[in-house]
């Protein structure tokens, strides 16, 4: 499997995020998709992993923003299965253990975390398979909408790319938009028991830096569309 990271003008946080996967033989490659960071920052990242064959680094020719860069990261993956992660979060061996604890990976399922520690706790939904057939009854759960906009999950590469839609840039509602399209296509989001990571809330996050650019009313519109699937 591939672990794919999106990043922009980050070094130390990125290195912390990547570290747990370097020695794990279950991970065939770590992809870093750099969204046209400053030249000196990209040069530092490239030098950091120059002798690490498992790490493959790509730089966009221009800044695509988070939603489109996620597609780039997945496109660069050479494995059938991909964990798409944010570069300002931290992970552990147990994150991968939880993925491999699933007896069989389903190409139409996305495996979502049950807990983005410490603030975003979705364990009330743990073990739930969410589809367009039951989203109406599940979404009113206060944490479900947050979970659908959290990403940091595991899926089939080709199915992700098939569903991905280029018609708008949802900015900070990017995960919610993709997950709406994922469910609309007849796929499932599984809140995976034991799948947890540390989700850093900070002023330099993509959300904090860009929430004002998100199209007015888009988040609420997507939640309404999910109810009506």
Residue ranges and their predicted role:
Residues 34-43, 62:
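A conserved acidic beta->alpha catalytic loop
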Residues 96-126:
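Conserved donor NDP-sugar-binding/catalytic core segment of glycosyltransferases
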Residues 10-23:
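Short, well-formed alpha-helical segments that are part of the catalytic scaffolds
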Residues 170-178:
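Acidic donor-binding loop at a coil-to-helix junction in glycosyltransferase catalytic cores
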Residues 117-118, 192-211:
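Active-site donor/metal-binding and catalytic loop motifs
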Residues 82:
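Short aromatic/hydrophobic "clamp" motif used to bind/position activated sugar donors
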Residues 28-36, 58-59:
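Short beta-strand/loop segment that forms part of the nucleotide-sugar
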